[in-house]
């Protein structure tokens, strides 16, 4: 792809998200979502192969359906209130449709089926944009309309997402699919605390984006896409392999790493609001995610990974790609837990 065209497309994606985040008019929000969706499709199809085409088509169809639901919710709201203002939804039907549309855009269960398939079919760099930047716009709208969201609906969606994000990743060997299921589970954690403390949702989103960006950057540096190729990285880049494993465990929420902080704070916030059964269930279900991250870590630490094919050993070469921000990202992904007392201002 021509570098100038690529930069224009990236700027369009950024502009689309910014329009959604700063708009107070529903029509502008919808336009921002459409810009965002149409701009990322050429990036997904950077590699011309059937898998990328299929993934882009699936993404286009699901996002179009979500945009249609969003517009339907806006029109119903307009009929009852006569207003285009983003902040408040005056009708329960409009609120329900809007929540479902945003859940579909975020890839939350039960609208999650497109996320693993699309992530698996596109390059790692496109997967990084899809699982990080593309979450900002829908999450910002959810943050703005949270007072009028149906509590039971959003909690049902979040619990389903945490459960399916854990179960779905158990049987995977493809790292992109594992990251996709991890994304579904993280979206569940974010939306579970949204009705109680929306600022906590933003904190969780920031930490999730940092950890996912770090993981994808290291996968791209090593061209790692499967459990098998991950198990051979120790011979190629031993230091980076250790960092990958630490970040994986952080994503699983293992103390004393950064990923434990949002889970701890969310459970604390929900128990303060007299919700006991739900956080208990969420904490138990989080062990599913931790299990498949631990399994990846274990398989990588084996001296010889059990594989049927005769795979050549990787050789240590100096990395040609410049990794300027990687040390900072790894530190943020693994060592933020001591900052937790400073975040008491969120309450």
From Swiss-Prot:
Segments crossing the lipid bilayer: 3-23, 25-45, 67-87, 96-116, 122-142, 145-165, 178-198, 200-220, 239-259, 274-294, 325-345
N-terminal signal peptide: none
Keywords: Electron transport, Formylation, Membrane, Mitochondrion, Mitochondrion inner membrane, NAD, Respiratory chain, Translocase, Transmembrane, Transmembrane helix, Transport, Ubiquinone
GO biological process: mitochondrial electron transport, NADH to ubiquinone; mitochondrial respiratory chain complex I assembly
Source species, domain of life: Eukaryota
InterPro entries linked to this entry: Complex_I_Subunit_2, NADH_DH_su2_C, NADH_UbQ_OxRdtase_chain2, ND/Mrp_TM
Keyword Ribosomal protein assigned: no
GO molecular-function term, one example from the UniProt record: NADH dehydrogenase (ubiquinone) activity
Subcellular location: Mitochondrion inner membrane
Membrane topology per record: Multi-pass membrane protein
N-formylmethionine PTM sites in chain numbering: 1
Any one GO cellular component localisation term in the record: respiratory chain complex I
Family that this chain belongs to: Belongs to the complex I subunit 2 family.
Name under which the protein is recorded: NADH-ubiquinone oxidoreductase chain 2
Encoding gene (name): MT-ND2
């Amino acid at each position: 792809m021509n570098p100038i065209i690529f930069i224009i497309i990236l700027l369009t994606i950024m502009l689309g998200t910014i329009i959604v985040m700063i708009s107070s008019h529903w029509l502008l929000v919808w336009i921002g979502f459409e810009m965002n969706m149409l701009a990322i499709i050429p990036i997904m199809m950077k590699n011309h192969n059937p898998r990328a085409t299929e993934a882009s088509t699936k993404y286009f169809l699901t996002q179009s359906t979500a945009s249609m639901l969003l517009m339907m919710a806006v029109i119903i709201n307009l009929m009852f209130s006569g207003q285009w203002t983003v902040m408040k939804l005056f009708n329960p039907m409009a609120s329900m449709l809007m929540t479902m549309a945003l859940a579909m855009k975020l890839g939350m269960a039960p609208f999650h089926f497109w996320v693993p398939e699309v992530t698996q079919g596109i390059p790692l760099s496109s997967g990084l944009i899809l699982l990080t930047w593309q979450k900002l716009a829908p999450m910002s709208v959810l943050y703005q309309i949270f007072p009028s969201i149906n509590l039971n609906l959003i909690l049902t969606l979040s619990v389903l997402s945490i459960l399916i994000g854990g179960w779905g990743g158990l049987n995977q060997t493809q790292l992109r699919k594992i990251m996709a299921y991890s994304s579904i589970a993280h979206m569940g954690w974010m939306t579970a605390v949204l009705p109680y403390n929306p600022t906590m949702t933003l904190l969780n989103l920031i930490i999730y984006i940092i950890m996912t960006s770090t993981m994808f950057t290291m996968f791209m540096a090593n061209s790692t896409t499967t459990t098998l190729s991950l198990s051979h990285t120790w011979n190629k880049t031993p230091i980076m392999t250790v960092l990958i494993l630490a970040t994986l465990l952080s994503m699983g929420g293992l103390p004393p790493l950064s990923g434990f902080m949002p889970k701890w704070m969310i459970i604390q916030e929900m128990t303060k609001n007299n919700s006991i059964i739900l956080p208990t269930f969420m904490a138990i279900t989080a062990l599913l995610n931790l299990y498949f991250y631990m399994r990846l870590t274990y398989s990588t630490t084996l001296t010889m990974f059990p594989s049927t094919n005769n795979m050549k050993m990787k050789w240590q070469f100096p990395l040609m790609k410049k990794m300027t921000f990687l040390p900072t990202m790894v530190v943020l992904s693994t060592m933020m837990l001591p900052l937790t007392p400073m975040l008491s201002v969120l309450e």
